[in-house]
């Protein structure tokens, strides 16, 4: 419902965004902070703060950081896999999900909007 969505959004603003804000070491463009917030809401602020995207943002490379929300530096999709619950060769099996990859691509596009 719309009410539940609004409540969740307020919860994110109050609980997660102040923690996320401490991870940036410089003034952050709004589009970057918005997409970092989306990422943090989905994966946890600690994952976002420790991400390769955050490393790029804190180095002042806004576009690279935004790109890293969707792709590795090698061009492979990231943050687009789910665990299957199986373990193969001692490692958790991950399954690529096209819908998640599409979402990450959309977040990248939003993130770079208006950047210099």
Where are these regions (language model features)?
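Long, amphipathic alpha-helical surface segments
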Residues: 3-18, 46-116
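Active-site nucleophile-His-acid catalytic modules used for acyl/amide transfer and hydrolysis
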Residues: 14-51
């Amino acid at each position: 419902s719309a009410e539940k969505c609004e409540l969740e959004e307020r919860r994110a603003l109050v609980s997660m965004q102040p923690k996320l804000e401490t991870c940036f070491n410089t003034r952050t463009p709004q589009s970057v902070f918005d997409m970092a917030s989306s990422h943090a809401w989905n994966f946890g602020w600690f994952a976002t703060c420790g991400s390769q995207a955050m490393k790029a943002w804190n180095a002042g490379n806004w576009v690279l950081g935004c790109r890293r929300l969707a792709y590795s530096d090698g061009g492979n999709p990231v943050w687009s896999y789910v665990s299957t619950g199986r373990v193969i060769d001692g490692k958790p099996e991950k399954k690529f999900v096209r819908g998640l990859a599409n979402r990450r691509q959309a977040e990248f596009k939003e993130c770079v909007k208006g950047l210099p």
